[in-house]
Each structure stands twice: as C-alpha cells, then as structure tokens.
Amino acid sequence: MKNMLRTTVLLASLTGLLVLIGDYFGGTGGMIIAFLFAVIMNFGSYWYSDKIVLKMYRAREVTPAESPNLHRIVDGLALKANIPKPKVYVVDSGMPNAFATGRNPQHAAVAVTTGILNLLSYEEIEGVLAHELAHVKNRDTLISAVAATFAGVITMLATWARWAAIFGGFGGRDDDNGGIIGFIVMAVLAPLAATLIQLAISRSREFAADEEGARISKKPWALADALEKLEYGNSHFQPSIRDVQAKETSAHMFIVNPLKGGTLQSLFRTHPVTDERVKRLRAMRF
C-alpha cells in the first residue's frame, strides 16, 4: 500500500512538473501539450516501465535450457518466497550486478549481468537472487521502475534544455532572455531532481530486502560475501558511455550502486553503505 502511494505521488509529480514546464515555455498551448504528454508518460510508466528498463540494458530472456543453474535457483527461491516465478533475464555486461523489475509479483522479472555470473559462486548468486525476489515480494519493483522512467524523462528534459539554451530557446515566452535563463536553470537543476527522485525510493528498502532475502535463502553469509565482491567489482569496472547514461537514471534498482562515488555522489547515495549491510547480514542467524 505504501509503495502504491509513493508510485501515485511520483506520477502526479511528473504530471505537475511537465505542466509547469509547458506553461513556462509555451503558455496555455504548451501546458496542454505537456499535460497530454504527461498522461501518455504516466500510462507508459505504469504498464511498460519494466520493459523500458530491460530494453535500456538490452536484457535478453533466457530459458531453462540456456541457463539451467539460474532457473534452478529462481525456481527454488520463488517457491520459498511463496510468489510466482519471475521471468529470468541476462544482461551482456561485464558490470557485476543484478536487479528486479515488474509492476507486481505476477508480472516480475529478475536480471543478472554476465559479470555477476562470472564473479560469484553458486551460493552467492543464490543470495543475490533471494535479495531481488525479496524486492518482488515486498512490491518495491513497480516504484523502482517508475522512478527510473521518471528520472530518464527528467534527464531528457535537461539535455533538451541545454541545447535550447545554446540555440536561444524555441520561441516560448516573449522575454527571450528570461526564456534562455529558464532553459539554463532547468539544465542545471534537472539532473539533481533526477537524483532526488531516486533518493525518494528509501534506502531502508535495501536493508529490508537484505533481511527478507536472507530469510528466504537461509544463507545471510552468502549475500554478505556477494555484496563485498560486488562492491569491489563495480568500483573497478570501466563502463561504456551507454552504460553510464543508463545507470544515472536507474542506479537505485541495482543490488549495489553501479556508479563510482565521489564526495557529492556519497552525499546523494542511493544505497546504504555496503559495509553496514554486510555487518547486519553477518549478525543474522536463521
């Protein structure tokens, strides 16, 4: 119920933001166009956000014949978690990570990268997937996917605003200088807004998924070992430009933050500190 409320707030916020932008740069006509665009975006975010995220990473669905061990793990964990088995996807990327998506447990998917499959042991992968199925069970996946779509739209608007500022705007308000200033302000603030949206998806849900995942697998130590390896692996991974652009809007979805953090990144951290997560997991007994 809480996640559905947050999703509704996000969708309403997206509508309000787009309408305000449309009104500022295009007056009444711009506001109407922005509202219609927002309605389409809201519909798409709810029904297709999971597909958008999977397509963003070029994830491919794998069959039991292609990945028997992966399906064996998901089969067992879904049974223990008492949820329908999600679809299983693999992302061809050296970045060691995993995420879950879907609007509800009946329409869910889990995705792992080839990097994580090459890095972790069978039991560690089991620990990671138990964490992801915990997100499915806790219904975190819809709001995460919607937030990723929302952040993507805002990032797109920021890019558009930068080009508009460079070329003098697109003929909105009568005050040309004011319009250009508006574009510049939007270009600067939009990426920050996208990050704040991801922060709104509470870090506490990662602790909750760690605990629930440990209960499902009965192997908290396996997830703890996996998190340590993933933290190290992601910090040494050199992503492509496309990877970076995708991760900026969906970093909150992954089991560990795929973005390399500086001081500012640490201030706007989308995940709890990995050391704290590991400490809590190692203290668990089932």
UniProtKB/Swiss-Prot annotation:
Cellular localisation: Cell membrane
Disulfide bonds: none
One GO CC term, this protein: plasma membrane
Cofactor binding note of this UniProt entry: Binds 1 zinc ion per subunit.
GO molecular function, one term: metalloendopeptidase activity
Cofactor: Zn(2+)
Signal peptide bounds: none
UniProt keyword Signal present: no
Keyword annotations of the record: Cell membrane, Hydrolase, Membrane, Metal-binding, Metalloprotease, Protease, Transmembrane, Transmembrane helix, Zinc
Topology class, membrane: Multi-pass membrane protein
Annotated family: Belongs to the peptidase M48B family.
HAMAP family: Pept_M48_protease_HtpX
Entry protein name: Protease HtpX homolog 1
Organism: Methanosarcina acetivorans (strain ATCC 35395 / DSM 2834 / JCM 12185 / C2A)
